[in-house]
Regions:
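Hydrophobic C-terminal alpha-helix "anchor/cap" residues
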Residues: 18-20, 28, 174
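Short aromatic-enriched loop/helix-cap "lid" or pocket-rim segments at secondary-structure transitions
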Residues: 40-43, 108-109, 196
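Metal-dependent nucleotidyltransferase catalytic core
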Residues: 1-17, 21-23, 34-43, 49-97, ...
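A short, charged helix-loop
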Residues: 112-142
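Acidic, glycine- and histidine-enriched catalytic cores of nucleic acid- and nucleotide-handling enzymes
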Residues: 87-124
Length: 261
């Protein structure tokens, strides 16, 4: 076991040991790589869900009552959902959510591991981890349409001088739509590595050539990135039925003054 994995496990063991002794804690769930320890490396954070009795949520939300080694914290902050994030002086990251068992039913989950369960936690986690996540429910025809839309949308923002907004549209929205279309169309090299909730996670292992192409494209200026992404979509998905619609690609190119695809 690597030093990173040992340190990761020891920190989690300490937190769980502390939390499981508290009468208002119903359960503790490890999420993401905190659950799937095979993925742990030096960059892995800790992501935990703390399930509590009704009325105890605020006692755990800011982390002040349970985060270990508080003297080493650089910051801890509460987010809109009542959980929070913290960072230690060595760069160790922690994020957490807090809910009652009933409140947990409104969550979404992918990889998880129930560590403490004093009633109902495992059942609810099984339910929410199998629930469809509409934002990642791939539909190739829809997703390619969104991809083409975002190319024009993003380049338009760029030509207005809104470079930050444009960059987000092209590098996040357009790329996300393209990857969703790919997932609906092209078998992954290793489907098990893909994340159900975040379509950008571990694409490099599932579609290595495509991921490398997209990374190179996104390193360019916004408009060059957008134009490269259109070429990448056509190269990987094809132009015409079942791929990038020819009339849609032509309309994008004509509107933006690019060479015909």
């Amino acid at each position: 076991m690597t030093e990173a994995k040992i340190a990761h496990r020891e920190w989690l063991d300490g937190v769980v040991s502390s939390l499981c002794e508290r009468p208002d804690v119903v359960g503790v769930v490890a999420m993401g790589s905190t659950a799937d320890t095979r993925r742990v490396d030096e960059w892995s954070d800790h992501d935990v869900a703390i399930i509590v009795n009704e009325g105890a949520e605020t006692h755990y939300g800011d982390g002040s009552t349970w985060l270990p080694h508080p003297e080493s914290l650089v910051f801890r902050t509460v987010e809109h959902h009542g959980g929070g994030k913290a960072m230690y002086a060595d760069g160790h990251l922690v994020e957490w959510g807090v809910a009652t068992v009933e409140g947990l039913r409104g969550w979404l989950a992918d990889d998880y591991r129930v560590i403490v369960d004093h009633g109902g936690v495992a059942e609810v986690m099984a339910e929410i981890s199998s629930r469809p996540f509409p934002a990642n429910d791939a539909d190739a025809e829809r997703d390619i349409a969104v991809f083409l839309f975002e190319l024009v949308h993003g380049v338009g923002r760029s030509r207005r001088g809104e470079s930050l907004s444009a960059g987000n549209i092209i590098r996040a929205e357009a790329v996300g739509a393209l990857l969703s279309a790919v997932r609906a169309t092209i078998p992954a090299r290793d489907p098990g590595v893909l994340d159900r909730l975040d379509g950008l996670r571990r694409v490099e292992r599932a579609y290595p050539d495509l991921a490398a192409d997209i990374a190179r494209a996104c390193a360019q200026d916004v408009e060059d990135a957008a134009q490269s992404l259109l070429r990448i979509a056509i190269r990987h998905l094809g132009l015409g039925p079942g791929g990038v619609p020819a009339d849609g690609a032509a309309a994008v190119a004509a509107r933006l003054g690019w060479p015909p695809p």
